């Protein structure tokens, strides 16, 4: 059940015809009311999917996860492919597509980019509302002709990233990717809207040092931390090197060199 804190009270409502039953299911699953006259947010069932809408006169537009159309789809088609800085940061090279755990998945945008480039992705999102939006977006994208094969490479886990990483079973990821919540300075309207919506629900990641420590213990090859370009490194072990962009920076914590799969298979034979 989600704790209803001051300034972040949420109700669930159906805007789509016939969506009342599904709204009731989400409300029960998340422990949220279907009616609350004093709610600050509404988790809304619409014909286009699940969305989060801040309530009030000056509220920004709703946020919904959409991997098929909009900005995410545009980035998939025209974003630069393997030349993108995030691709370089996780170690994508000819013949190398590492398995990646995105332990701060958010709305899944970075994970989708990496999946579209061929990486097998695990995603962790600890905030239940954001995880619900992401789950809904993945479900809708799974049936799409163009992106269904990409979504098939994305596995969503919900819960505390530190706990899930420490209790990880099975083959560990080669790379763990972290983008802890930090005051963003990007000037796009979309980022502003999402940050404005999510900050009351999520706050800053005060446990980022513990998350980095857990990630370093699990990842077999490297940990990558995305930061605003001028932000300090996360407290703890210093990165081996960094990749700087216009607004963001990727701190790289290398453990072992990534190799093409064929070379890895031959060496293990």
UniProtKB/Swiss-Prot annotation:
EC top class, as a word: transferase
Cited SUPFAM superfamilies: S-adenosyl-L-methionine-dependent methyltransferases
GO cellular component term of the entry, any: cytoplasm
Annotated localization: Cytoplasm
InterPro entries (alphabetical): 16SrRNA_methylTrfase_J, SAM-dependent_MTases_sf
Keyword Transcription regulation found: no
Enzyme Commission identifier(s): 2.1.1.242
UniProt catalytic activity: guanosine(1516) in 16S rRNA + S-adenosyl-L-methionine = N(2)-methylguanosine(1516) in 16S rRNA + S-adenosyl-L-homocysteine + H(+)
Keywords: Cytoplasm, Methyltransferase, rRNA processing, S-adenosyl-L-methionine, Transferase
Molecular function terms from GO: rRNA (guanine-N2-)-methyltransferase activity
Record: residues binding S-adenosyl-L-methionine: 125-126, 179
Matching PANTHER family: RIBOSOMAL RNA SMALL SUBUNIT METHYLTRANSFERASE J
Summary of the function given for this chain in its UniProt record: Specifically methylates the guanosine in position 1516 of 16S rRNA.
Family classification: Belongs to the methyltransferase superfamily. RsmJ family.
Protein name per UniProt: Ribosomal RNA small subunit methyltransferase J
Organism encoding this protein: Pseudomonas syringae pv. syringae (strain B728a)
Gene: rsmJ
């Amino acid at each position: 059940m989600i704790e209803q804190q001051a300034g972040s009270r949420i109700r669930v409502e159906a805007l789509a015809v016939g969506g009342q039953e599904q709204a009731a299911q989400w409300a029960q699953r998340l422990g949220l009311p279907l009616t609350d006259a004093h709610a600050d947010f509404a988790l809304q069932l619409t014909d286009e999917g699940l969305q989060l809408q801040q309530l009030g006169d000056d509220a920004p537009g709703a946020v919904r996860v959409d991997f098929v159309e909009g900005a995410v789809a545009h980035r998939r088609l025209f974003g630069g492919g393997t030349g993108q800085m995030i691709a370089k940061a996780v170690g994508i090279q000819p013949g190398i597509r590492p398995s990646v755990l995105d332990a701060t998945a958010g709305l899944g945008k970075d994970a989708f980019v990496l999946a579209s480039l061929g990486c097998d992705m695990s995603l962790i999102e600890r905030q239940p509302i954001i995880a619900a939006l992401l789950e809904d977006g993945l479900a809708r994208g799974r049936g799409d002709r163009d992106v269904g094969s990409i979504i098939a490479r994305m596995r969503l886990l919900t819960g505390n990233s530190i706990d899930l990483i420490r209790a990880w079973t099975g083959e560990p990821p080669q790379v763990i990717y972290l983008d802890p919540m930090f005051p963003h300075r990007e000037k796009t309207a979309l980022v502003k809207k999402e940050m404005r919506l999510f900050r009351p629900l999520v706050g800053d990641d005060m446990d980022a040092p513990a998350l980095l420590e857990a990630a370093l213990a699990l990842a077999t090859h490297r940990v990558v931390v995305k930061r605003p370009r001028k932000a300090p490194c996360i407290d703890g072990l210093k990165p081996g090197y960094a990749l700087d962009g216009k607004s963001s920076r990727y701190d790289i914590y290398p453990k072992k060199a990534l190799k093409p799969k064929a070379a890895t298979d031959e060496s293990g034979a």
